[in-house]
Each structure stands twice: as structure tokens, then as C-alpha cells.
Amino acid sequence: FYPCMPYAHKYANAATEHGLIEALRRFLPQDGALSGMLQAGKSLASKDIEGILQLLVDAEMKMFQGLNTPVIFMQNVIVDLLYGLGIHEAFRMFADHVKSRYDAEPGFITMNLPALLDVLERQGVDNPIVCANINKIGFRMSGGLPLYEQIIATRRVRPIAMSVLASGALPAREAVEYVCR
């Protein structure tokens, strides 16, 4: 399994349907649920980004307990939001937590590979696994196709292609041949 988290809509819906305390109780690991709620409250009150991030990851990983999860991805909505807000240290915090707590590699999903890769390098996330739009016609590829090709050829990154078919604009064989070369 390759979990992708945190799924923000799930938390918003749960808080709306069940209230904040019940939502926290449902998503926090059962062992130490009270301490988890206290930690969540403390992290939110102090705006402790690392504590909040760890709680969200741990809550999501609860459903994968006992399963092999070699890579844990941070969802693109969160990645690109943190990038845009300039909270770049959160990427290092996520990477460190995923490695130390789950013995997994961190992965990042983004709509802007060039910008994110620069930030990850500055944060010390070496040779990251990054899932981004990569396709033959440059569909939704921030910076354009030539820049992505240059990055993939010259920089330390392990890319995973999404939107390979460019939202149906490319025939499957042509699309797959491009990303596999």
C-alpha cells in the first residue's frame, strides 16, 4: 500500500457531522486516545505545525496498521498549500516523521515539480519521490514540458507520473511510451 495523506475533506466532513471532539476521537490511534486529544489541543493552540502534522499522519496511518507501506505520500492539496504559504519546513518534518515512525520513505504529490523540488532540496530532502503531472504534451505541467524533461534528466528526483494520458488527449500507447522512455 502507498497511502496518500492527509485527506483534508475527510476531517472537515467528520467535524461537521460529529463535532470536533468526536472527530478527533474517531481518527486518533486507540492507544492513548486521551493523550492524543490533549496533544491535538495543545498543538492547535500553540500553532505547532510539527505536532499537528504528526497527528494527522498518525491518524491516517491507523488504518494501515500491520500492512507494508514502503512510501507514504503527502497529498497534493496539502503539499501545494504548504508551499504557497511558505511553510517549507513542514516537508522536512513530514519526511523525518514518516522515516522514524513508520520506516517508510516520504513521497510528495504536487502540481508544480520544479518549484517543489527546489524547496525539498533546501530542506534537505535528498532524492525525493515526487508524483507530478508528466505527459507528452505538457498538460498541467507547471513550467512546461522542456523544464520537466531537463529536471528528470539532470536532478536527483524519483518521479512518478500522473495525468499520463493528459486527460484523454493522448492515446494510451503513445502516452505510456513517452513516460517509460
Descriptions of predicted regions:
Residues 1-85:
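Active-site beta->alpha loop and helix N-cap motifs at the rims of alpha/beta catalytic domains
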